[in-house]
Design a protein with these regions (language model features):
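Structural preference for long, well-ordered alpha-helical segments in enzyme cores
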Residues: 1, 31-42, 59, 94
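Flexible, glycine-/charge-rich segments associated with ATP-binding catalytic modules
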Residues: 4, 8, 13, 33, ...
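Conserved short strand/loop->alpha-helix "switch" segment adjacent to the catalytic nucleotide/phosphoryl-transfer site
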Residues: 6-37, 43-51
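Active-site-proximal flexible loops/turns
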Residues: 48, 80-81
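Short beta-strand/loop element within the Bergerat-fold HATPase_c
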Residues: 52-65
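Acidic ATP/Mg2+-coordinating residue in the GHKL
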Residues: 73
Length: 139
């Protein structure tokens, strides 16, 4: 996937997983597509000058069926006045639609270095154990 962006784009990727619970295949598919789009955006836009981008992916599952996927980069962040709930191209539209399909929330923090995106899927067996910050619903 990242290789299709050209050899001039470099990424240092760190992945951390916690929890021993499995998620439904449909949920895994949606979460995987959202993660792929977030990684692609990080490589394409985090460092417009072409510097390597550092990206951390964190995946967490809980007994109640809830899960969290967090993708954080060290880039320049969103452009001024960019609203991830309404702006963006086809990739952001896709992420919002997939988030709706999961009945999940896609949260963005971008007030510091880079962008932090969190996909939070509440549990299907009761209340979610994953802490959630104010969210951007998949509009």
């Amino acid at each position: 996937m990242i290789g299709t962006l050209g050899p001039e784009r470099k990424m240092n990727l760190t992945v951390a997983c916690s929890g021993e619970n499995h998620i439904e295949p449909r949920h895994a598919l949606h979460a995987g597509l959202i993660t792929a789009e977030l990684l692609t955006n990080a490589v394409k836009y985090a460092h417009p000058t072409g510097l390597p981008v550092s990206v951390q992916v964190r995946y967490e599952t809980n007994d109640d069926g809830s899960f969290l996927v967090e993708v954080t980069d060290d880039g320049v962040g969103f452009p001024e006045n960019f609203d991830p709930t309404t702006d963006g191209g086809l990739g952001f539209q896709l992420m919002r639609a997939l988030t709706r399909g999961l009945n999940a929330e896609l949260q963005f923090e971008h007030d510091c270095l880079g962008v932090c995106a969190r996909l939070v899927k509440p549990g299907t067996f009761g209340g979610a154990n994953i802490e959630s910050t104010p969210a951007v619903k998949g509009n």
